């Protein structure tokens, strides 16, 4: 009887060991698959994709903060959207930059920006410092994904730079038209203008809860904020300092 119990216990123990080994093997296989998927996203630079720290380490972080000329593929995404037929800026004056950023949950995302070549190096340095500090930026994909519709892009809290367009309500070209201005977390840092009739225009429209800068909320840019400090240190001006309007999302050179 004792011998039979010993045999049964031995069998049960062996089964537990096998199950544990299978679970570990499945876990390792899942991690390998996840890393391969991340590396594929990194190779293709699928902006907006969440990737792991391990994948970044394997891929190489220096490859994740890069300035490139506008390729045919990128220009194809932009043409007749952010880069309109009457655009006064040459394709050669623009640059495509790859960056990493984190959201409010600490996830790492692939980001992309089209900017003027004269601020490309500034942006690479700034965004790398923001990434190292885990500064939250929710989304950073080309505005062309929103058909260059500024309202839609801002409403999605998408940070963007180049877009050939006029200043809201005017016939003057925006600094965005040359890729010399960038908007960061625009939903939570809206454009606010008091009209002659006394009403207040807010862009994006759904950003109105964040027009009151006395409130505390995530993604808010203010003067003690790291994002503000870095852009100012690199010679940018902040729209939140303007007197006639307030553009809290906006930094320009």
Regions found by a protein language model. Give the residues of each.
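Active-site acidic/histidine clusters and adjacent loop/turn architecture
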Residues: 89-154
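Bacterial N-terminal signal peptides that target proteins for export
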Residues: 1-7
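Bacterial N-terminal signal peptides
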Residues: 7-15
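Active-site-adjacent substructure of cysteine-protease-like catalytic cores
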Residues: 150-179
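N-terminal module-boundary/linker segments of secreted carbohydrate-active enzymes
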Residues: 23-102
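Catalytic cores and adjacent binding grooves of peptidoglycan-active enzymes
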Residues: 26-45, 167-169, 173, 179-253
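N-terminal Sec signal peptide cleavage junction
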Residues: 18-20
């Amino acid at each position: 009887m004792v011998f039979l119990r010993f045999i049964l216990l031995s069998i049960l123990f062996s089964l537990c060991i096998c199950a544990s080994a299978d679970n570990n093997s499945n876990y390792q296989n899942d991690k390998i698959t996840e890393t391969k998927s991340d590396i594929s996203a990194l190779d293709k630079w699928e902006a907006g994709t969440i990737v792991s720290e391990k994948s970044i380490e394997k891929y190489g972080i220096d490859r994740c903060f890069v300035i490139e000329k506008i390729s045919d593929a990128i220009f194809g995404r932009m043409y007749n959207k952010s880069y309109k037929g009457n655009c006064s800026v040459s394709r050669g004056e623009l640059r495509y930059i790859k960056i990493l950023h984190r959201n409010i949950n600490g996830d790492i995302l692939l980001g992309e920006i089209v900017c003027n070549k004269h601020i490309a190096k500034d942006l690479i340095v700034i965004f790398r410092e923001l990434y190292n500090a885990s500064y939250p930026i929710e989304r950073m994909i080309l505005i062309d994904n929103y058909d260059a519709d500024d309202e839609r892009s801002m409403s999605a809290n998408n940070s963007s730079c180049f877009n050939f367009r006029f200043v809201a309500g005017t016939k003057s070209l925006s600094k965005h038209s040359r890729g010399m201005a960038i908007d960061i977390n625009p939903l939570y840092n809206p454009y606010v203008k008091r009209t002659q009739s006394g009403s207040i225009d807010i862009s994006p429209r759904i950003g109105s809860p964040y027009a009151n800068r006395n409130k505390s909320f995530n993604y808010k840019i203010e003067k003690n904020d790291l994002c503000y400090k870095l852009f100012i240190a690199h010679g940018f001006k902040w729209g939140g300092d303007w007197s006639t309007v307030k553009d809290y999302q906006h930094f320009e050179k």
